[in-house]
Amino acid sequence: MPDPYAWLQNSLLTIHRADWYRSVQTIQGRAGASVVLGGKEVINFASNDYLGLAGDERLIAAAVAATQEFGTGSTGSRLLSGHRELHGELEKAIASWKQTEDALVFSSGYLANIGAIAALVGKRDLILSDQYNHSSLKNGAILSGATVREYSHCEVGELKTQLLEQRQNYRRCLILTDSVFSMDGDLCPLPALLDLAEQFSCMLLVDEAHATGVMGKTGAGCVEHFGCTGRQLIQIGTLSKALGSLGGYVAGSHPLIDYLRNRAPSWIYTTGLSPADTAAALAAINIAQQEPQHRMQLWHNVNYLRELLQKIPNLKLLPSASPILCFQLSSPSEALQVGKQLKQAGIFAPAIRPPTVPTSRIRISLMATHKPAHIEKLVAVLADIS
């Protein structure tokens, strides 16, 4: 009989030949603007720790205190033994920050997306999704069983055409979009999407993963940034990027959150977020709101790097309005080579390749804790390489 697992090795060979093979790179020591990678200190431009809070002593102290009081794990699902007072405090803090009626905390942003989407739509419904949406949105759409159609990236006109042609054929319609697109750094046209959602009686779900703590006057996200606070939509985000912890959330109306508590499988059938992660996220939200200087420093760094990168000839910098800056390369092999050269020069900014993105690139993530010397070294190395 043939080996039913033989195809695995063949598939790995195909991945290698296409220069798509991936492996982990072990980071040593505490999270920060500089980390130790393979025994060598490098400047970290690969992290989503935008405000530099993952290594903040106050988050660490909050996590330690919660662990000492409650133990290491939540021990059960939130509907059984896994709900702590801390969870409720965190959900109230998120709802207050986002200016929504309520919020619900999940064990990760990925689980928040797939759980919410699966709960909101089904076989009689339509999902319209931006083609560059995060994998969690795309997989949630597939798992829901709804009819899924993609529209070209940020093309509101095409989305409207699809709504005109298809909306009347379905019970419900859910529009899905990232607010900050994680592999490009650009923003969705949120006000126009909200207008279409209202015009065609659609739900709109916006993933604020890379906007939470970063965008808007108080860091509440792109909904705040675009002046759309108070408009009817579903906001999802993560606690693991600018907030330096772990977990995800959904924020919205009381009926929405109450419904998800009863119908979102990835919330109902999994262990609640650990006390340590919950306490750290709560501390991070307080810091993000009370200490805007971290966000101001982040944006100063973003603007400084963009200004310097624009002076490098032949660098194909992609449009961005966030702390994510990418420059495009011709092939996966070139991206791998540039990533290797950067690493040899003490810069950690790995290659991003298909199928994660349509075209290969180097992705640079800025942090509030980057110093001018870090940014200047990155630019000098890129100028030499290009």
From Swiss-Prot:
Catalyzes the decarboxylative condensation of pimeloyl-[acyl-carrier protein] and L-alanine to produce 8-amino-7-oxononanoate (AON), [acyl-carrier protein], and carbon dioxide. Its EC number is 2.3.1.47. It comes from the Bacteria. It comes from Trichormus variabilis (strain ATCC 29413 / PCC 7937) (Anabaena variabilis). Homodimer. Belongs to the class-II pyridoxal-phosphate-dependent aminotransferase family. BioF subfamily. Pyridoxal 5'-phosphate binds at G109, Y110, S182, D207, E208, A209, H210, T238, L239, S240, K241. Keywords: Biotin biosynthesis, Pyridoxal phosphate, Transferase. PANTHER family: 8-AMINO-7-OXONONANOATE SYNTHASE, CLASS II AMINOTRANSFERASE/8-AMINO-7-OXONONANOATE SYNTHASE. It catalyses: 6-carboxyhexanoyl-[ACP] + L-alanine + H(+) = (8S)-8-amino-7-oxononanoate + holo-[ACP] + CO2. GO terms for biological process: biotin biosynthetic process. Its cofactor is pyridoxal 5'-phosphate. Substrate binds at R22, H134, T356. This is Putative 8-amino-7-oxononanoate synthase. One of its GO terms (molecular function) is pyridoxal phosphate binding. Pathway: Cofactor biosynthesis; biotin biosynthesis. The modification N6-(pyridoxal phosphate)lysine is found at K241. It is an enzyme of class 2 (transferase). Pfam families: Aminotran_1_2. InterPro entries: Aminotrans_II_pyridoxalP_BS, Aminotransferase_I/II_large, AON_synthase_class-II, AONS_Archaea/Proteobacteria, PyrdxlP-dep_Trfase, PyrdxlP-dep_Trfase_major, PyrdxlP-dep_Trfase_small.
